[in-house]
Amino acid sequence: YSCGTCAPCQMGLTQFCKSKRSVGIDRDGAMTDYVVLPASYLHKVPDEIPDKLACIIEPFSMIYGNIVPVIRQTKAKNVVIIGAGQVGMFALVAAKSASVETVIMSGTTRDVDYRFPVAKKLGASDTIDSLTASLPDKIMELTNGAGADVVLDASGSEAGIHQGMQILRHGGTLIAMGMTRKESIPINWDACLKKAMHINFHMQSNYQYMDEAIQFFAHPYTDLSVLITKEAPLSQWKSLFDYMDTHDTLKNVLYID
């Protein structure tokens, strides 16, 4: 919920409202039969979108609304995504929706069996295990020595951020969307200046991003159901949560039974 009167709200940046209250964080969530919301915050979901996919539009909208404009503005022909989790997968989908020719996903050995195959189904050109291969060497090989037009860090790891800066081409853009959970991390400021790199920090969604994401989900470029690992009725919420604790998953859906 946003106040509609503060400076960010007046600029259309309702996600940065100084009085913002989020459902599931500051207000009760929606793992229940009924939830009370202001009508002005509701979006109509087209019939073409299955309920299970409608459930993941909100987190996807943050990635889609922030990444696609950068890709179009920079006319990126290749994008490297560091991190094969939910944010990374959403970034992959967003990049492919913007007609990026080459999208490369970097992850770790734990991603090889499940997440990398999902990434390939979603259109990833290549997947790289950064624990067994040199990410900088591999990216330079795949880009003929030019480096990446856009790097999106979805890992929040210090090593991932540093590698992202290293593989970026001169004048390229680093999009930061991974939380480091640290007060600060060191970066080579002079190296950033010499590369004339652009660094964009993005967080949160707004009503416009949601609408744009809904329009995309109604006519996606591929089957997005591969993003859903498991579904369960609300009455079996505990078993689903237990499953998530013991298995590698992406998005999981509870439905009203």
What are these regions (language model features)?
Residues 6, 45, 63, 95, ...:
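Residue-level signal for nonpolar/aromatic packing positions in well-ordered secondary structure
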Residues 34, 80-84, 106-108, 128, ...:
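Glycine- and other small-residue-rich loops at beta-strand/loop junctions that grip anionic moieties
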Residues 70-75, 113, 117, 121-198:
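Glycine-rich cofactor phosphate-binding loops and adjacent beta1-alpha1 units
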Residues 1, 130-134, 155-156, 180, ...:
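Short beta->alpha linker loops
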Residues 90, 133-134, 162-166, 170, ...:
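C-terminal hydrophobic helical "lid"/dimerization subdomain
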Residues 49-132:
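Mid-domain Rossmann-like dinucleotide-binding core that forms the NAD(H)/NADP(H) cofactor-binding site
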Residues 1-82, 111:
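NAD(P)H dinucleotide-binding glycine-rich loop of Rossmann-like/cofactor-binding domains
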Residues 80, 104, 173-175, 200, ...:
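Structural detector of well-ordered beta-strand residues that form the stable sheet scaffold
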